[in-house]
Amino acid sequence: MNTSPATLPPAPARAPRLSAADWAQVALDVIAEQGVAAVAVEPLARRLGVTKGSFYWHFPSRDALLQAALERWEEVEQQQVFGSLEEEPDPRERLRRLFQLVGHETRPHAIYSELLKALEHPAVAPVIQRVSQRRLEYLTASFRQAGLSRNEAQNRARLTYAAYVGFLQLRPHQPKMTHEEFEEYLE
């Protein structure tokens, strides 16, 4: 049998090399689409076009993947939402831009909404608690910078955050708002 390089059959295409971040991102995609309970190794591997071995190369368990996905979401959410507002010196304009930002981004809302439904999960609850606390602190500080007293700022922050969570619950069941309608909503 001739096995010179010219006569060997082509090697089969290899699956892409995945990182732990790739697995965490696809887990977040599934959370957004189907919830925390839908995060399972075999379906994720099929979705990525790889074997379970790729998963176990990066994670010892589903819980470890879920933890990595939650950490990724927490970090990216912080950077995307609050990082983009750091350059705005006017606290009122910063709050307005924050409301516009959270009113138009759907993927982070979907993940957050699904995580709120899974608060009984031991990995989810502390992440939501940290994210909520950080958001409330940010809102309180912004309202303080806008001239409200500490107590007024805390109350306004809680009310604003509660309205945001309620907005997320109502949003999937309401007609989609146009940009102009959302701007009126903010006024």
Stretches found by the model and what they are:
Residues 1-18, 148:
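N-terminal intrinsically disordered/low-complexity leader segments
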Residues 22, 26-68:
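Helix-turn-helix
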Residues 26-34, 80, 84, 114, ...:
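Solvent-exposed, amphipathic alpha-helical segments
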Residues 78, 105-109, 113, 122-147, ...:
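Amphipathic alpha-helical packing segments from all-alpha helical-bundle domains
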Residues 105, 118, 163:
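Conserved catalytic core of Hanks-type protein kinase domains
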